[in-house]
Amino acid sequence: MAQDRECLCSAGFQRGDYTQGNTDRSTAAANSRPPAGQRGAEEPSSGGAGTPPPAAVLPTMPDEATENAGSTSARVSSFFIEDLLGTEGGGGTRRAAAGGGGGRGAPRCGPHSPLRLGASGCPLRDAAVGWYRRAFLGCASPDTSDRDSPELPEDTERAGGGGRAAARGPAGGRQSSGGREEEEERGEEAGEAEQRAAGRKKKTRTVFSRSQVFQLESTFDVKRYLSSSERAGLAASLHLTETQVKIWFQNRRNKWKRQLAADLEAANLSHAAQRIVRVPILYHENSPASALGFGLPHMSPPLVGFSGGVSYPLGTFPAASLPFLRSQMTGLV
């Protein structure tokens, strides 16, 4: 029993030492920590190289501050002369001199403010206002807008393509008005051409009275072609123009030629039909063969009868048809 009590006492003593050691350590750590205000100031220095400090706490150098201020001021469109001259510096005077020498020698009125600035510091409105001011003061004509207008950087020109068109307002207006006038003139010319073509197509046909047609027909039967004097006299007597009489005679001659061609064609067809028709030959049975006179041409030939009841002598037939007649007669016998 005594041994058990000694073991328990030793165990409790060790446990008490352990808890006391832990409490001593916690108090020492609490005492070693700095106050809240000092802790925020010391944390950036004790952070190490691996962890970057916050951006708001980083100290800024004077050069960086001036650069940031210059960039913000350049981004903001400022219209003060001091800002414009300060941003460009000494290079502005050289550019202004080069730009002035590149013109056509037009006189410059008043002080020339340099407008050729960077893309961020040169607004397009300044260029337009300066150009209009010079144009209205009579320093330069609007026709020389390409050379007298201030040259802008490429970025500004791309960004403000519509502004340049606005800056060329007077010249563009003239060109557009001239183009409209040309289009109107072309439209009028096209309309006149259409009217002329329509007038040519709508030719009215001359209507002749019965008395005029009778007189023209009687004159045509007498003479197919008229001289100029005859045509003039006929036109005066019929109260017509010479052109109308001339055209009527031309049409009448064409009609007459067509009628002649049709008559000739009909005559040729009838003649061909007459050649094709064959007529059978009949002879008398009692008449001897020697009486026909084929071998004696000096004797008067007898009559040969046809089916139509008409008799023709053999002398009327040509000599070439005698073999044909002989073959026909021998075939019938």
Curated annotation (Swiss-Prot):
DNA-binding region listed in the record: 201-260
Basic and acidic residues bias: start-end ranges: 144-158
Residue segments, region Disordered: 1-74, 86-109, 139-204
Biased composition (Gly residues): 87-105, 159-176
CDD domains to which the protein is assigned, alphabetical: homeodomain
Main location: nucleus
GO biological process: negative regulation of DNA-templated transcription; regulation of transcription by RNA polymerase II
GO CC terms, sorted: nucleus
Stored Pfam families: Homeodomain
Biased composition (Polar residues): 17-30
GO MF terms held by the record: DNA binding; DNA-binding transcription factor activity, RNA polymerase II-specific; RNA polymerase II transcription regulatory region sequence-specific DNA binding
Motif HMX family specific domain 1 per record, residues: 261-271
Coiled coil: none
Keywords annotated in UniProt: Developmental protein, DNA-binding, Homeobox, Nucleus, Repressor, Transcription, Transcription regulation
Family label: Belongs to the HMX homeobox family.
Protein name: Homeobox protein HMX1
Phylogenetic placement of the source organism: Eukaryota, Metazoa, Chordata, Craniata, Vertebrata
Name of the gene: HMX1
